[in-house]
């Protein structure tokens, strides 16, 4: 194990660049997947004729596919039908598709957890279905959904490492390149240990934030 060689200024800067790409891809994917997941989950909860059924089929299909397969599809299959995405866009698209399906189910379950008595009381007081959904059900449901949503975001951050298969210059990709510069593999343990600590620092911070939010709600 060569810690000194592995942790050279050049290597650390290169690894940090990969970490920034990981955070960027995760951040954009989180925003997009929450947006689409919220729409899909709400429409499934509202049971809009035909549309809800179509979304349910799409969500269940995506949830039962490996994320790696979706990454391959967005990067290698879409160009066959004239849609060519560069590496970062393909990674974000794949993560957004997969995580949107996961989040939509969390959101739908969260909305269903609200007591029907509150909904009936709101409707009897003169509120429309839409008003009841957005002003009574949604605010309460979102508070309950924070812990599982944060957990899903943590999974998303870790899942960015799968984009190494399409050569996204993220943390694991750059760690592999650094490791390849040692003829005897002496960089492997030091460099991947540091990569693991980087993932742990971010994910553990998110976990602590989720726990604190959960405690405040109880």
Swiss-Prot record:
Q: How does it assemble?
A: The complex is composed of two ATP-binding proteins (GlnQ), two transmembrane proteins (GlnM and GlnP) and a solute-binding protein (GlnH).
Q: What is its main location?
A: membrane
Which Gene3D superfamilies does UniProt cross-reference here? MetI-like
Classification from the root reads: Bacteria, Bacillati, Bacillota, Bacilli, Bacillales
**How does the entry describe its membrane topology?**
Multi-pass membrane protein
- What is the annotated localization of this protein? Cell membrane
Which residue intervals define the domain ABC transmembrane type-1 in the entry? 19-210
Q: Which segments cross the bilayer?
A: 19-39, 65-85, 188-208
Picking any one GO biological process from the record gives: amino acid transport
Q: What is this protein called?
A: Probable glutamine ABC transporter permease protein GlnP
């Amino acid at each position: 194990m060569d810690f000194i060689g592995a942790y050279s200024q050049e290597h650390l800067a290169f690894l940090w660049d990969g970490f920034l790409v990981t955070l960027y891809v995760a951040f954009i994917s989180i925003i997009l997947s929450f947006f689409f997941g919220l729409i899909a989950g709400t429409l499934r909860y509202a049971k809009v004729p035909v549309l809800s059924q179509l979304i349910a089929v799409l969500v269940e299909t995506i949830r039962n596919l490996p994320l790696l397969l979706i990454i391959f599809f967005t990067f290698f299959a879409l160009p066959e039908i004239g849609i060519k995405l560069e590496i970062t866009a393909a990674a974000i698209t794949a993560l957004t598709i997969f995580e949107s399906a996961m989040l939509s189910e969390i959101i739908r379950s969260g909305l269903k957890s609200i007591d029907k008595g509150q909904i009936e009381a709101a409707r009897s007081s003169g509120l429309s279905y839409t008003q009841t959904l957005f002003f009574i059900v949604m605010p309460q449901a979102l508070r309950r959904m924070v812990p599982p949503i944060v957990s899903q975001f943590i999974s998303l951050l870790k899942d960015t490492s799968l984009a190494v298969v399409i050569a996204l210059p993220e943390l694991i990709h750059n760690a592999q390149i650094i490791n390849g510069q040692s003829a005897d593999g002496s960089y492997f343990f030091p460099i991947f240990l540091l990569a693991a600590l980087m993932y742990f620092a971010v994910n553990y911070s998110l976990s602590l934030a989720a726990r604190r939010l959960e405690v405040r709600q109880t």
